[in-house]
């Protein structure tokens, strides 16, 4: 048994498909399948129930996968400790971002990170929160920029900024001329929402339900841009995060209205694994991103 075998096993548990797991490990499917069988022979247990349709792990297999994840995390920590000797801001940095933040934050922070930390080789990944946290847990990501939710409490959270949510309405909507609105005005309104898996959906719904609004049950969007286009078509109203509204003031068809009592918002944070020897690296990146966002938002006031 070696570290590579454990990586094959964990990849198979994530993809539940031999070819996709092999592709993720940059090996052929026969190689991965053969190593899994050798691992079973070495341990004297059956790890998988192999069917023509899907891969199922036995109870023993699931226990071994959990332990393999732990071993791989510790191996990554050892490598980080070795590479961290005098090279805190040097080397690869794998950052994940959620889809409701990434497209609007990256154009600002990518050039900033290159200028501030020229020796960092930054790799960027976009996925929903639960996927990012899984990859963070397994060590595939070093850190992630997400909206704080209960699931992020298992990690170290470094708040970057507090992001307002603005009410987006069609320019033909009766509220289009309002400069601001109290949240109780939403009582009885139907709101367009993102589909399941987006943390913004749950955060927006909490504010909506408290105000007496409800979700439009006939439509769910996969992206903020779809929501924006639906609003422009006067097909409904929704909440949009502040960064997604930057430079959108001149777009025809949509008006953005601040709300109050309470002001809807969410906290965007950089999260990383507890115990990481590269803590200072992540804290410095978080601080730099926070300063950049603050300067952007202050410039709009």
UniProtKB/Swiss-Prot annotation:
MF terms in GO: DNA binding; DNA-binding transcription factor activity
GO BP term, pick one: regulation of DNA-templated transcription
DNA-binding region(s) in UniProt: 18-37
Domain HTH lysR-type: 1-58
UniProt xrefs under SUPFAM superfamilies: Periplasmic binding protein-like II, Winged helix' DNA-binding domain
4Fe-4S is among the record's keywords: no
Listed PANTHER family: HYDROGEN PEROXIDE-INDUCIBLE GENES ACTIVATOR, TRANSCRIPTIONAL DUAL REGULATOR HCAR-RELATED
NCBIfam families in the record: PRK11151.1
Protein function: Required for the induction of a regulon of hydrogen peroxide inducible genes such as catalase and glutathione-reductase.
The name this protein goes by in its record: Hydrogen peroxide-inducible genes activator
Organism of this sequence: Haemophilus influenzae (strain ATCC 51907 / DSM 11121 / KW20 / Rd)
Lineage: Bacteria, Pseudomonadati, Pseudomonadota, Gammaproteobacteria, Pasteurellales
């Amino acid at each position: 048994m070696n570290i590579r075998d454990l990586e094959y096993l964990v990849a198979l548990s994530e993809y539940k498909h031999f070819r996709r797991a092999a592709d993720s490990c940059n090996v052929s499917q026969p190689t991965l399948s053969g190593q899994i069988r050798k691992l079973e022979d070495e341990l004297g247990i059956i790890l998988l129930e192999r069917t023509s349709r899907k891969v199922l792990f036995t109870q023993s297999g699931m226990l071994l996968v959990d332990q393999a994840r732990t071993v791989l995390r510790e191996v990554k920590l050892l490598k980080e400790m070795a590479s961290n000797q005098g090279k805190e801001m040097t080397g690869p940095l794998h950052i994940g971002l959620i889809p409701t933040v990434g497209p609007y934050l990256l154009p600002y922070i990518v050039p900033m990170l290159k200028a501030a930390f020229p020796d960092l080789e930054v790799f960027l990944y976009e996925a929903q929160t639960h996927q990012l946290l899984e990859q963070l847990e397994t060590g595939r990501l070093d850190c992630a920029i997400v909206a704080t939710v209960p699931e992020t409490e298992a990690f170290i959270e470094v708040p970057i900024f507090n992001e307002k949510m603005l009410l987006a309405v069609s320019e033909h909507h009766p509220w289009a001329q309002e400069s601001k609105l109290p949240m109780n005005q939403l009582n009885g309104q139907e709101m367009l929402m993102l589909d399941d898996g987006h943390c913004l959906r749950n955060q927006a719904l909490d504010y909506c339900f408290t105000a007496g609004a409800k979700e439009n049950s006939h439509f769910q969007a996969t992206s903020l841009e779809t929501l924006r286009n639906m609003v422009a078509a006067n097909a409904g109203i929704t909440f949009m995060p502040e960064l997604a509204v930057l430079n959108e003031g001149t777009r025809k068809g949509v008006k953005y209205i601040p709300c109050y009592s309470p002001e809807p918002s969410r906290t965007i944070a950089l999260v990383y694994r507890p115990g990481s020897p590269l803590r200072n690296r992540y804290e410095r990146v978080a601080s730099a991103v926070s300063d950049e966002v603050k300067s952007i938002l202050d410039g709009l006031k």
